Amino acid sequence: LSADQISTVQASFDKVKGDPVGILYAVFKADPSIMAKFTQFAGKDLESIKGTAPFETHANRIVGFFSKIIGELPNIEADVNTFVASHKPRGVTHDQLNNFRAGFVSYMKAHTDFAGAEAAWGATLDTFFGMIFSKM
């Protein structure tokens, strides 16, 4: 990743990282099978849990970790290893990760000037998920 790509991604993410509930909602809406992987949410209606404290806590955890990754670009090997160590044992699939990506990108398109950052995000997400897929 180039310095310009990293700067673009970081600036773009800074605009949305304060809405972790919205980000997680978009991801779960895009692929309910992702939500089903979390025992506290499995079998529940997304609309009814969106405003709850457990949902907000989990959203903060996920977006906080993603914020850490974005902040540490391009040095994300340790974060990838942490992610793989916690997600591989739970049987998270490549399809679910691709759907997570699609839900996240959809959220970004709706809440930022994504067109100007799309190439940088594409390169960043390709790098991140490529590293994960090589280990899962």
Curated annotation (Swiss-Prot):
Please provide an example of a Pfam family that matches this protein in its UniProt record. Answer: Globin
* InterPro entries linked: Erythrocruorin, Globin, Globin-like_sf, Globin/Proto, Mb-like_M
**Molecular functions per Gene Ontology:** heme binding; metal ion binding; oxygen binding; oxygen carrier activity
Q: Where is the Globin domain?
A: 1-136
Which residues are noted in the entry as heme b-binding? H87
Q: Does the keyword Iron apply?
A: yes
| SUPFAM superfamilies with a match to the protein in the record | Globin-like (SSF46458)
Provide the family line.
Answer: Belongs to the globin family.
Q: What else is known?
A: There are at least 12 different components in Midge globin.
Subunit note: Monomer.
In Swiss-Prot or TrEMBL terms, this protein is called: Globin CTP-III
Q: Which organism is it from?
A: Chironomus thummi piger
What does the record give as the organism's lineage?
Eukaryota, Metazoa, Ecdysozoa, Arthropoda, Hexapoda
